Design a protein with these regions (language model features):
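A detector for small-residue-rich transmembrane helices and their helix-helix packing motifs
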Residues: 1-214
């Protein structure tokens, strides 16, 4: 893992938030229940908007993460919440409270920065995607059941989700592109060094192969 993160953990490791995924998922379930049975406008009061932040509604820098990402149906929302719990708890076990807290909060920070700099209304899409990508990179061979029937390795879910993100990024306006990049801040911070090391190792292997063919 990254050297900067090791140093940060040695100094501030006690500030990791335990059971952070359970807190996140419990909040999303509560918001979903309120939206279904009490007040359908609850998401408006929690969502991340630059204009409303600048009016002093500062709670939105945190409250937006409790709005579950919607795929257009209640079933997709419920499945999304379950998947967040499944992936998030696995990452917590792998990384520990502190590193997982840094990962999640740096994603939140990137999303807030993207909203403030571009004015694009934020959602939890990139935050949820960042959890999936982290899980896919750490556990690429784990199998999940697509539609509860078809076994498929997590790495393929990750590739598919990454491709969708790339197409969304390419189709966005210039402010939208900046927002997409900033909203994935946690992925860049945690996995760019790993990707760089993997790329260097691949280049060295290819150079060694070419050299030994001669």
């Amino acid at each position: 893992m990254n050297n900067w993160l090791n140093r940060l953990e040695r100094k501030y490791g006690r500030y990791g938030i335990p059971n952070l995924t359970n807190i996140l998922v419990a909040g999303q379930i509560l918001v979903l229940a309120i939206e279904l049975f009490v007040d359908r406008t609850i998401s408006f009061w929690l969502g991340l908007s630059r204009s409303l932040l600048l009016q002093g509604q500062v709670w939105r820098v945190i409250s937006f993460i409790f709005i579950p990402f919607s795929g257009g149906s209640i079933l997709s929302v419920v499945l999304g919440i379950y998947f967040t719990w499944f992936v998030g708890t696995a990452l917590e076990r792998e990384w520990g409270d502190f590193r997982y807290t840094v990962y999640l909060l740096s994603g939140v920070l990137g999303t807030v920065l993207g909203c403030l700099l571009t004015g694009v209304t934020a959602s939890t899409y990139c935050l949820s995607l960042s959890l999936l990508l982290a899980f896919a990179m750490l556990y690429p061979e784990v199998q999940l059941l697509l539609f509860f029937v078809i076994p498929i390795r997590v790495k393929y879910f990750g590739v598919f989700a990454a491709v969708l993100w790339v197409f969304s990024f390419l189709g966005a306006s210039l402010p939208g592109k900046l927002d997409y990049l900033l909203s994935m801040l946690n992925v860049w911070l945690f996995f760019t060094p790993m990707a760089y090391r993997s790329l260097r190792a691949w280049v060295r292997r290819e150079q060694w192969k070419r050299k030994n063919r001669r």
